[in-house]
Regions:
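Glycine-rich dinucleotide-binding loop and its adjacent helix/turn
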Residues: 3-65, 154-169
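SH3/SH3-like beta-barrel fold
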Residues: 115-119
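A conserved short coil-to-beta-strand element within the FAD-binding core of flavoproteins
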Residues: 4-10, 103-114
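Internal hydrophobic alpha-helix adjacent to the cofactor/substrate pocket in enzyme cavities
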Residues: 58-72, 151-153, 171-191
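Rossmann-like dinucleotide-binding cores of NAD(P)H-dependent redox enzymes
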Residues: 59-105, 165, 191
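Core beta-strand elements of the Rossmann-like FAD/NAD(P) dinucleotide-binding domain
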Residues: 42, 121-130
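Glycine-/small-residue-rich beta->alpha transition segments that form the dinucleotide
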Residues: 1-8, 28-31, 128-141
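FAD-binding beta-loop-beta segment adjacent to the flavin cofactor pocket
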Residues: 137-159, 168
Length: 191
């Protein structure tokens, strides 16, 4: 249950992502290896595919480590789904740390040490020491039908909530959790 990285059928993606000893990570792969990344990455190249909230989290993490960062976004602007305060803060951070911003650029192929991307000026290689594919999250609710079957004969209400229903932002999950607690309190299940 919950959500997992969205990994579309892009040439080389599944061959390279989150492989032991590899250099290409999903956000979950990054989190699982967060302590393995050096504190000082000066002179190292980081390439991030995806200019949404998750990709920008990766940028923020590595900018503090003095890496040379490039972020690739297929849309015309980076951080389109962010609230205005966060978007402005990220723009300032990217400017301060000299992050290369490549908009209207799409991932074509994933290689061991580079991404092949295509923008308005054609296709080119984007080399990296560490590459990150942050194209969003997708719901993983495969256990929900099993839970419905398991409790079909009981007087138990089963709800599919959170990212297993639909992947979304943390603020949405927080609001949903608050609403569930409110309704449980109203029904007398919580004091």
């Amino acid at each position: 249950t919950g959500s997992g990285p969205l990994l579309p059928p892009i040439k080389g993606l599944m061959d390279n992502i989150d492989k032991e000893g590899g250099n290409v990570y999903s956000i979950l792969g990054m989190i699982n290896h967060i302590n393995d990344f050096p504190e000082d990455l000066e002179g190292k190249k980081i390439a991030v595919i995806g200019g949404g909230a998750v990709g920008l989290d990766v940028v923020e993490f590595f900018a503090a480590r003095k890496a040379d960062i490039s972020i690739v976004e297929m849309m015309d602007q980076i951080g389109r789904d962010l609230d205005p305060v966060t978007k402005n803060d990220m723009k300032c951070q990217m400017k301060t740390h000299g992050v290369h911003q490549l908009t209207q650029t799409a991932l074509q192929e994933v290689k061991e040490h580079s991404f092949l991307v295509k923008g308005s000026d054609g296709s080119y290689e984007l080399p990296f020491d560490y590459g990150f594919v942050c194209l969003g999250m997708r719901a993983k609710g495969q256990l929900y039908p099993q839970l419905l079957d398991a409790f079909a004969d009981d007087d138990v209400e089963i709800l599919n909530i959170g990212d297993s229903q639909r992947a979304r932002r943390i603020i949405d999950g927080t609001m949903e959790g608050r609403n569930i607690l409110y309704h449980l309190t109203q029904r007398g299940y919580l004091d």
